Amino acid sequence: EKQVRIWRRSYDIPPPMLNPGDPRSPVFEKKYRNIDPKILPMGESLEMTCQRVLPFWNDAIAPLILEGKNVLVAAHGNSLRALVKYLKQIPDSEIPNLEIPTGMPQIFEMRQDLSVARDFYLS
């Protein structure tokens, strides 16, 4: 249980990677059938998740915000942790303490330079 928490909450400690033939591998999930199996993660740390999430932030989400649009992001918990870490500039050493409640929208008000002016949960 302690080791699982370390894998789930640390920034740069990944869990053991799945073998490609493992039945839990994402290559066997229908929703990924149109994605090159070589790019599907077999497990990842939050650091690795950031490497996947931040290009999407920069290429898809940030431009919409700069156009003045409101953007709703619904994602897996670790993807949200990666995005919140980036937006709030949370140091790696503090990331194990970041709690993101399930099903509770978090609002980010952004400045023109895309820094966070304020954030809060709708409750």
Name the predicted role of every residue range:
Residues Q3-M48:
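Short glycine/proline- and acidic residue-enriched helix-loop micro-motifs
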Residues Q3, M17-P20, M42, L46-E47, ...:
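Acidic, low-complexity terminal tails and accessory targeting/binding regions
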Residues K31-R33, V73, E99:
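Short alpha-helical linear motifs
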Residues R9-D12, G68-N70, A74-N78:
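Short, well-ordered beta-to-alpha junction loops that form the rim of enzyme active sites
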